[in-house]
Amino acid sequence: MRSGYTLPVFACAGAIAALHWLRQRQSLQVGLVDLIEPAQMAEVPIEQVAGLSENMALAITRSDPGDNIDLTKNTPIWAVVEWGQGGGEQVTIKGGEGIGKQVNADNRAAIYSYAQRLLQANLTRLLAPEESIIVTIILPEGRSLAVRTSNSAFGVVEGLSLLGTTGISQPLSSPDQLDAFRSELQHKASLYASLVFCIGENGLDLARKIGINAEKLVKTANWLGPMLVEAEALGVKEILLFGYHGKLMKLAGGIFHTHHHLADGRREVLATHCALGGLSKQDIEIVFHAPTAEAALKHLKALDSSTGSDWVNQVYSAIAETIDSRCQEYMQSHSSRGTAATICGSILFDRDRKIIVKSKTACNLMGNLC
């Protein structure tokens, strides 16, 4: 299967082409981008370049994530570059139309650290010391595409994020992607007895912010099952699962590959634990038919607020304990020894990146992870 590039790479290539027009008044056919992560160069086709004024140019690229299930495939990325006034930052990066806003960070543009590094590194080297530019990234289809994502669950509204830690976009079903994650796990398992599994970038980011040692973080994407089995085989003593509740709760239903194209089960997990906890039939039905896990959580919060109950804590504590036990069972069933020595705990957070619950085991593990 064919890999491609992540959105920040196309944004960067467009910015390089727009800057080239400002300097040379010529259109580039290909933007050459240093990916940084990994250490290799990428040749990105440039669709169009136009001068908007003497001091401003626009270049357009088109997203190609490879053979990946990605709604950004073929979406256009615009990069507008204009000369700055000098002084301050050499490269100022802004988010235009279609770039999401972080509601929990003063509506700052959702252009995250890798994209920032990529743009800064590739553009600064093309500038003289006294020169400065302002780069505005625009996703014309970003606002409409964002409706089909879970971005709002992570506090990003009105558009898409320039997210990621690498320039390469591997197909979700690609063995190469799993091999890369396993390789990182093998390296970190040789250094630490306790590790933290994060499905995606939001988990990695929040884990760092609450004080977890970044060196102990391992990205799993949706491959939680194989990664748990690998960790157990490598002799990892403790694993903390740290993730968005709408993803991580799938493990409570025995779903160990969490991509939505393969399985869901969230409403079944939520409704089951509500029923086991004694929630009324009417409220269970509301939870079961909620359009998202976030909407179901909101209903439980409303119940707690109006009645003084403790349904959020009760239901989610039960889900977290089920996640822990299902993970133990999964590792044991796949262990060559017939038993699993690895201990699992779980922490679930909501759309506002606020922690909903920590399992009992997770509370015990935290001291070894910070």
Curated annotation (Swiss-Prot):
Root EC class: transferase
Cystine pairings recorded for this chain: none
GO BP term (any one): anaerobic cobalamin biosynthetic process
Key words of the record: Cobalamin biosynthesis, Methyltransferase, S-adenosyl-L-methionine, Transferase
EC number: 2.1.1.195
Family: Belongs to the CbiD family.
Protein name in UniProt: Cobalt-precorrin-5B C(1)-methyltransferase
Provenance organism: Trichormus variabilis (strain ATCC 29413 / PCC 7937) (Anabaena variabilis)
